[in-house]
């Protein structure tokens, strides 16, 4: 009888951890950079259930619709990798896309968004997009930024000739940084 009580107690102590692990769900919503990290994110978040909706050339304005398509099953944590394919002259449009993503997420979900690295388009840099993300994150407790721009500045050897995509080492590092932020959601 004493042994049975010990087993029952052990099961009770383990049950909450299992329930917590099952509730750790992530949606990756992104462009070609998310395609690049697709194989590495699950390695960094082995105890998470991960869904990935990635498409080369996906735009920021498409992000909210991707999230809406999940309906009530939208995970509590969402990683967004969008903005790289958008016109840097349209900061207001990007800001509107960020607002729409955050509106769909609601206040109960955590959004982890990687800021943007790419060469200027028509002489305009993406600094305005990164400032918009930084400002939004100051106003919203549930928006966390992965400072991809800083990471790439520290490791320019990761960049490919197009100045956007990176080596396998760069994608692994990006996945690790995303995973660190994802794990902090809820804390």
Predicted regions and their residues:
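Positively charged n-region of N-terminal signal peptides that target proteins for export
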Residues: 1-4
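Bacterial N-terminal signal peptides
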Residues: 6-16
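Sec/Tat signal peptide C-region and signal peptidase I cleavage site
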Residues: 17-21
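Conserved SGNH/GDSL esterase-like catalytic core that processes O-acyl groups on lipids
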Residues: 22-100, 119-128
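Hydrophobic/aromatic beta-strand patches that form the interior of the parallel beta-sheet core
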Residues: 27-29, 112, 144-146
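Conserved beta-strand termini and adjacent loop/short-helix elements that scaffold enzyme active sites
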Residues: 53-55, 114, 146-151
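A short helix->loop->beta-strand "cap" motif at the edges of active sites that frequently abuts
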Residues: 106-110
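Catalytic His-Asp segment of secreted/periplasmic serine-dependent ester chemistry enzymes
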Residues: 119-187
